């Protein structure tokens, strides 16, 4: 059966050997028997495009125990990187388990893939397994977008996901490193991290992160805390001063200048100015007698 992701990203038959996990042991042996190579573990390097940055040691130990009992049913897949040096394309967890078991060689299929194909397969394989953290998943989406020059919408269509899912994951990459590290280490959940995004101030984001971890705030408590902070930092609206039209200013200045001229003539003129919402009021008192 063709792998949907591989087909959509243009690998076609080239990656058919990577899809053997859904086939029977007998089918696997028939399909890849002549293509399996025993490669020294010392000559194999991890995938440089591996999106997974955290490997669960306990899960690797469990896998090693399974391999010790049943053998390595599915060979790893590699490509030749340099002379006598191979880079893992798929199967790094199996490789790590075999290393823990002290194996000197590991069964492998050698594929001829370029850097873009190698990176894409590593990313797609891990996305299929759905064991990545939210940050690792976001990094995988971003790399696929860059490798294949895709929009978020196009990537969502190829992966069979909603565009909002892709967009929400990618927003996590804009968070400070400490928050992304907490996501990787599972100190906070993805929903905690997403709640921090509206706080544009990094100092505030890190302050709330510390509160989440120390006080073990749940998501609702975190959202309430952030809503309060946003209310506190919201700039207070200044009362708008009503604009005075140019014609009004000319009129006022003309009256003032006239009053000054009258005063210079010797008359003791008193005037008062008052400003109302809709008008200015000028009261002028001219004595009948000097």
Swiss-Prot record:
Keywords (A to Z) from UniProt: Cell cycle, Cell division, Cytoplasm, DNA-binding, Septation
Protein family per UniProt: Belongs to the ParB family.
Name of the gene: noc
GO molecular function: DNA binding
Gene3D superfamilies named among the record's database cross-references: 1.10.10.2830, 3.90.1530.30
One of the protein's GO biological processes: chromosome segregation
Protein name listed in UniProt: Nucleoid occlusion protein
Organism of this sequence: Bacillus cytotoxicus (strain DSM 22905 / CIP 110041 / 391-98 / NVH 391-98)
Disulfide bonds: none
Matching SUPFAM superfamilies: ParB/Sulfiredoxin
GO cellular component, one term: nucleoid
DNA-binding region(s), chain positions: 153-172
Superkingdom per UniProt: Bacteria
Function: Effects nucleoid occlusion by binding relatively nonspecifically to DNA and preventing the assembly of the division machinery in the vicinity of the nucleoid, especially under conditions that disturb the cell cycle. It helps to coordinate cell division and chromosome segregation by preventing the formation of the Z ring through the nucleoid, which would cause chromosome breakage.
